[in-house]
């Protein structure tokens, strides 16, 4: 649960940390049945934030790759690996909190 809530307090200047925590939440939200449209919308906001925080194209590319990797691992956890798979009730609550914060801050796609 700590990792899920860390997206709101991720180091503002660290696009890779934002990518990892954001993708962890979004991947798990997708796994838990949150609509593709909602996950995509939140992902677009997070990717935009990553782009604006990145110092250069290389940093943006690294963060983007981490986002893609972490999302895939969270959305489709392998049964044979020991991975953190939070309960869907927690994931959906945190995802809804993220959506609310995005709306309050005026973030759009």
Language-model segment annotations:
Residues 41-109:
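Compact alpha-helical subdomains of small soluble proteins
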